[in-house]
Amino acid sequence: MQVTILGAGAFGTALSIALCNTGKKVRIWSRNGQVVESLRTHGENSVYLPGFKVPREVLVHSDMGLATDGPAAILMCVPAQELRSLCNTITAASALEAGVPLLVCSKGIENSSLKFPSEVVAEMFPQNPVFVLSGPALARELASGLPCAMVLAGDEITTAETLASQLSGPALAIVHSGDLMGVQVGAVMKNIIAIASGIIAGMGLGHNASAIVMVQGMSEIKAVCEAKVGVAATETLIGLSCLGDLVLTCTAPGSRNMSFGSSVGKAGRAGASGQQKPMLVEGVESVTAMVNMGKALNLELPICSAIARMLHGQLGVRQAAAEILSAPVKSRLNV
């Protein structure tokens, strides 16, 4: 099976290693000249994933036309705010064939439109089936070959099941789901909740308080799922893309969102911490859009609201933590 990965950040690079090690023919594309040079010359992404060798069988491209010529599937591994730009680059290359499955790995919301990643891609490529690959997968562990499980969601459930089986390997289990929207809601909101969890940890408020954040966070995820699609699927809420990814992102030292929050909690202010994080912090990028979506859906999202106002300088860190912990732990989690 030949696959193309568009985007050579930490996750895209780790995915190229994992898929190559399961016998896939892998191409990886990047518009970053430094990354391309590092991969070609040293077999390593020294910018985003230093210390991990990329198999020489992985073909590295900077030409979109060559990268997207004839793969069985394309995995889009760029930040949510760069997704539409990536689609425009693909369109300009005129190489994408109709019917080729597009697997979106972005976790976020497009700020300008409040659209989820699958909606952006489906709008740009109506002739291609769109899926979302998500779940608890730290890049360094994925690249190391440690056990990992993810979910592939899409409206075309039979194709999703086939792709999940084809992409799986001994250390990488991929299951399929028909809940395209629910999986994406969990993917974006868990990053925001992880920032809150990190703040609580950084302030030294204890594990009990962290548990409050995660439960309240699950309640907010459930509320958005219900408002968007009318129902929150139990298998999604307690599955890999929501509960699984939430727990990982809120607790793992390698989680950028939790680490960012912890730095904020320790520093007592948000400004300086952001300058210490050169890597993308997805929750920071998406929280304002998530608050705006909540308003449009007439929802109260206390964690999202507190984090957004804190990042915009409208709320101090201690006040944000107090609001988060005083938010009523909803009883909506009847799963």
Swiss-Prot record:
Sn-glycerol 3-phosphate binds at residues 107, 135, 190, 245, 255-257. One of its GO terms (molecular function) is glycerol-3-phosphate dehydrogenase [NAD(P)+] activity. The keyword NAD applies. Its EC number is 1.1.1.94. Gene3D superfamilies: N-(1-d-carboxylethyl)-l-norvaline Dehydrogenase, domain 2 (1.10.1040.10), NAD(P)-binding Rossmann-like Domain (3.40.50.720). GO terms for biological process: carbohydrate metabolic process; glycerol-3-phosphate biosynthetic process; glycerol-3-phosphate catabolic process; glycerophospholipid metabolic process; phospholipid biosynthetic process. Belongs to the NAD-dependent glycerol-3-phosphate dehydrogenase family. SUPFAM superfamilies: 6-phosphogluconate dehydrogenase C-terminal domain-like (SSF48179), NAD(P)-binding Rossmann-fold domains (SSF51735). GO terms for cellular component: cytosol. The active site is at 190 (proton acceptor). Disulfide bonds: none annotated. PROSITE patterns: NAD_G3PDH. It is found in: Cytoplasm. NADPH binds at residues 11, 31, 107, 139, 256, 280, 282. Catalyzes the reduction of the glycolytic intermediate dihydroxyacetone phosphate (DHAP) to sn-glycerol 3-phosphate (G3P), the key precursor for phospholipid synthesis. InterPro entries: 6-PGluconate_DH-like_C_sf, 6PGD_dom2, G3P_DH_NAD-dep, G3P_DH_NAD-dep_C, G3P_DH_NAD-dep_N, NAD(P)-bd_dom_sf. It comes from the Bacteria. This is Glycerol-3-phosphate dehydrogenase [NAD(P)+]. It catalyses: sn-glycerol 3-phosphate + NAD(+) = dihydroxyacetone phosphate + NADH + H(+); sn-glycerol 3-phosphate + NADP(+) = dihydroxyacetone phosphate + NADPH + H(+). The keyword Phosphoprotein does not apply. Keywords: Cytoplasm, Lipid biosynthesis, Lipid metabolism, NAD, NADP, Nucleotide-binding, Oxidoreductase, Phospholipid biosynthesis, Phospholipid metabolism. Pathway: Membrane lipid metabolism; glycerophospholipid metabolism.
